[in-house]
């Protein structure tokens, strides 16, 4: 039986071989970028046009990256790269959204809590402690997947919305807007 006569799934064709070749190429490119600190060099290069601030809204830290994260992340990578090529200095700092319902729902489900009274009975302080402990269970996966998308972002110096300094900066910003009667 010739290759053309085989069922499509068992044929050896260029797309099957190409995937393996592409995977090898991906690994080589990522290794080259890492060994030569290419991302870091973009941050160190001369920026005659000054700073360009790019606000990158962080993903929730409670799950694995999905298509929506990858798509949004690609868009969020293009703009800072473009501005860097135009001569701006653009910090690209990763962030983690650690607040709100996603983490609360996750902990409630894990602990079998269904109502506010259940949480109070369990103990709010203990509930919050469990939430903080579980927030970064997927961090390793994110740190592996995001660079594989080709995105250049500083994940080692990430900000976390649950950190006091971050929360205080949000309150400070809100106060500035309030005093200017913008909110």
Model-derived features with residue positions:
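N-terminal, positively charged nucleic-acid-binding surface of large information/translation enzymes
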Residues: 2-183
